[in-house]
Amino acid sequence: MAEKRLFGTFGVRRTANDVLTPEFASRLAASYGSIVQGTVAIGGDTRTSTPMLKHAITAGLLSSGCDVVDLGILPTPAIQYAVRNYYDGGIIVTASHNPPKYNGLKFVDEFGIGNPDDMELEVEKLYFDSEPNRASWDKIGTVYTNESIIKEYIAETLKRVDVEAIRARKLKVVVDCGSGAGSYTAPYILKELGCEVTTLNCQADGFFPGRDPEPIEPNLQDLIATVKDLGADIGLAHDGDADRTICIDEKGNFVLGDKTFALVEKQMLKENDGGIIVTTVATSQAIYDIAEEYGGEVIATAVGDLLVARKLKDTDGLFGGEENGGLIFPDFIYGGDAAMTVAKILEILVKEDKPLSELVAELPVYYQEKLKVECPDDLKQDVMSKIADEIKETTDFELDTTDGVKILKEDGWVIIRPSGTEPIFRCFAESDSQEKADEMASWGISLVEKYKN
């Protein structure tokens, strides 16, 4: 297969109006539209460049002969829901958790799943090596709008949990939408669930003034403090496009995405008497332990929600997700879904009648460390090859090269993988003690440093 030149793990992400210009976006959209030749939905997150890019991709799609349905500014999973149910494809303008200067284009097929490699290569071939279809004047597409999708998405989310039971509990919830697209959904869903809601950063703003879009612990100190000050049952945080949720327990503890995944996995397997769970090679051993206990089967893919989603579809999987808090409920949407995650977590709190900290404490215990190190994109492949060679030649550790280099030791593992959207390597480690996890992650970083210079 030819090497892709534009698409990364999550579509195309670049600095807005630098590399990701209107001209670039329009031609790429025209290339995509030339293949789809149908009705394409578009929408995006709250970034300052999103309206500019939406207009550009609209022009490109119309030029190729596609009709366009503009869904507005809304969460990525709401757009995926709309495409899966009504349209032939979609383009989502988002850079998810990346800093404000970035934006991106995420292309999805008629199921709302990120397009497979062969289609992305076909789009790139049209973009670079030939010309997109340019419709004759009487075949140019038409623009429509659909402003009802958010309400429909919220209603469909609520259908999938026991609303009355959650309402009866009157949970006290603090939600931090990070000024992103979740601002249009999360507060309303929580109110429909009868929660006493306190909002932080729930005014949409593409400059993300309250915090960085990535919901990692250093960025959520205001949320943590508010949960403790108010005596809330739970704190919730979204990334920029609201396709993932991070939880804070009632004591103000940051709950790793793996733990949230494990909680929901356990509940889903209990409710369905087992099933296929799809995750990535970077996910905790706890996911495997729970599957074994509750009749599940785990399938691992490379990192990327579209890979997990496609495997869920191909295997008729029950549930899936990633370690970053992006959980996929395939009977609803083939992609990470912050709103559905929130609703399900609240339902678990109510059904189990236990605080979040206690539910987390009941899960299998592993310790993790997550580090990252800068590395130019053009060196990444060479660095990975040299790391793999060193491990093979100097140790007897097991290697998994599904995505990057995963080194499996008797007391844990470390995965060293290149980011698909940034010039960095991420090193995730897990072990039976925090000290060992820290050591393994630092070792992974040292291997990258050794071979990038």
Locations of regions flagged by a protein language model:
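An N-terminal, well-structured beta->alpha segment
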Residues: 1-65, 142-173
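Gly/Ser/Thr-enriched, mixed-charge loops and adjacent short helices
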Residues: 2, 15, 103-230
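N-terminal small/polar loop signature for handling phosphorylated ligands or for N-terminal nucleophile
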Residues: 30, 34, 40-102, 189-248
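Short glycine-centered, acidic/aromatic-flanked micro-motifs in structured strand/loop junctions
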Residues: 43-45, 175-177, 249, 331, ...
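Short beta-strand-to-turn element immediately C-terminal to the catalytic PLP-Schiff-base lysine
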Residues: 107-110, 246-250, 328-330
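Proline/glycine-rich low-complexity loops and linkers
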Residues: 121-155, 159, 250-323, 328
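Phosphate-binding and adjacent anionic-ligand microenvironments
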Residues: 234, 272-453
